Swiss-Prot record:
Domain of life: Bacteria
Family of the protein in this entry: Belongs to the IspG family.
Enzyme class: oxidoreductase
The protein's required cofactors: [4Fe-4S] cluster
Residues reported in the UniProt entry to bind [4Fe-4S] cluster: C306, C309, C340, E347
Protein name listed in UniProt: 4-hydroxy-3-methylbut-2-en-1-yl diphosphate synthase (ferredoxin)
Organism from which the protein derives: Parasynechococcus marenigrum (strain WH8102)
GO MF entries: 4 iron, 4 sulfur cluster binding; 4-hydroxy-3-methylbut-2-en-1-yl diphosphate synthase activity (ferredoxin); iron ion binding
Keyword field contains Disulfide bond: no
Length: 398
């Protein structure tokens, strides 16, 4: 298939990547896009951290990240992991490591399935307000320090068959990257590639990469440039997508979707996190909704419903809620609720079942494109359930 054919195809063609194992969860183009999140409890509060991890896993997070800003937090992860497993929860755990974190990362790597580092902070020097430039010699000297500091962690992760996320944040680029490339997607990409090349030199390839920013256009440019740069240099590592600090409510969800869904539609992205200033478990339905809307995963009923207009023959919003309440547990079905027969049958042609206003007070029920029966409006929802039962596709709610 040519690039032009792919552009106009109705299915998304994902960028081909290697598979990276995080515990027993596979990340990469041969596998479904993975949903993950991060607890907001203090890691030193063992009971609260364990409860947060289990709660996220039960909500559908397939990987859970925990912050480890100190050695005490890193050591606590051993107890946390044991307690999580004792509760029968097998979700893979990721440790988040930032400022000058090699010792922390070396400690916590024993207790988790993946370590996340921030290239801009991993070898951190306080910025000099009087600095005017970085010479090539100074740039290279810091690069040598990074290599020396990073190598023991890479070796440990390689030998233990653990994973690493090279997680760049637009807001925390190293001073030398800012001087050399500016506060740009190019600076983000070069920050990541410096660490990618070290891993490659040390024959470690269990890597996932993220390029997060709080503004969707910056994030989009950085991920696209990262993918192109890896392709040029012969690397095929998976991408972890996210818009950092997206906020809360409708806007936070829309902002995250604008960034994540745009890249997924381009075929980029192998695991996602929607970052909201809310309880972490509220991020999970947004992730699955993004994936389902793009046809990348199907984890819920797909409802097709018209927006309502003057032709609508019943209270469409009310009926849609009733249909959803009755059928939302039937994962895998497509159900259409359409207000009239003008557009209804055509727009819902791909649905498994249709509920369409036929005439005032009368509902037509469809199986695919075929009209099966007409029923009084007040019997419509129950008749739809009965039709699904007749087809052997009904299961009782849990």
């Amino acid at each position: 298939m040519t690039a032009l054919d792919r552009r106009y195809d109705t299915q998304i063609h994902r960028r081909i990547t290697r598979t990276v194992m995080v515990g027993d969860v596979a990340i990469g183009s041969d596998h479904p896009v993975v949903v993950q999140s991060m607890i907001n409890e203090d890691t030193l509060d063992i009971d609260a951290a364990v409860a947060g991890i289990v709660r996220l896993a039960e909500a559908g997070s397939e990987i859970v990240r925990v912050t480890t800003p100190s050695m005490a937090h890193a050591r606590a992860m051993g107890e946390i992991r044991a307690a999580v497993r004792a509760r029968g929860c097998t979700v893979p755990l990721v440790a988040d490591v930032h400022h000058n974190g090699v010792k922390i990362a070396m400690e916590v790597a024993q207790h988790v399935d993946k370590v996340r580092i921030n290239p801009g902070l991993f070898v951190f020097d306080k910025p000099d307000p009087n600095r005017q430039e970085f010479s090539d010699k100074e740039f290279a000297a810091i690069g040598a320090r990074i290599h020396e500091t990073f190598e023991p962690l890479v070796t440990l992760l390689r030998d233990q068959n653990k994973a690493l996320r090279i997680g760049v944040n637009h807001g925390s680029l190293a001073e030398r990257m800012l001087f050399t490339y500016g506060d740009t997607p190019k600076g983000m990409v070069e920050s990541a590639m410096e660490f990618v090349r070290i891993c490659d030199e040390l024959d470690f390839h269990n890597i996932v990469i993220s390029m997060k920013a709080s503004r969707a256009p910056v994030m989009l440019a950085a991920y696209r440039l990262m993918a192109d740069t890896m392709d040029k240099e012969g690397f095929n590592y998976p991408l972890h997508l996210g818009v950092t600090e997206a906020g809360d409510g409708d806007y936070g969800r829309v902002k995250s979707t604008a960034g994540i869904a745009t890249l997924l539609a381009d075929g980029l992205g192998d695991t996602i996190r929607v970052s909201l200033t809310e309880a972490p478990e509220r991020e999970i339905p947004v992730c699955y909704s993004i994936l389902q809307s793009l046809g990348l995963r199907k984890t819920m009923v797909e409802y097709v419903a018209c927006p309502s207009c003057g032709r609508t023959l019943f209270n469409l919003e009310e009926v849609l809620h009733k249909v959803r309440d009755a059928t939302s547990h039937l994962t895998g079905l497509d159900i259409a609720v359409m207000g009239c027969i003008v557009n209804g049958p055509g727009e819902m042609a791909d649905a498994d079942y249709g509920y369409v206003g036929k005439t005032p007070g009368v509902i037509s029920l469809y199986r695919g494109r075929d009209e099966i029966r007409k029923v009084p409006e007040e019997e419509g929802v129950n008749a739809l359930i009965q039709l699904i039962k007749e087809d052997g596709r009904w299961v009782e709610p849990a």
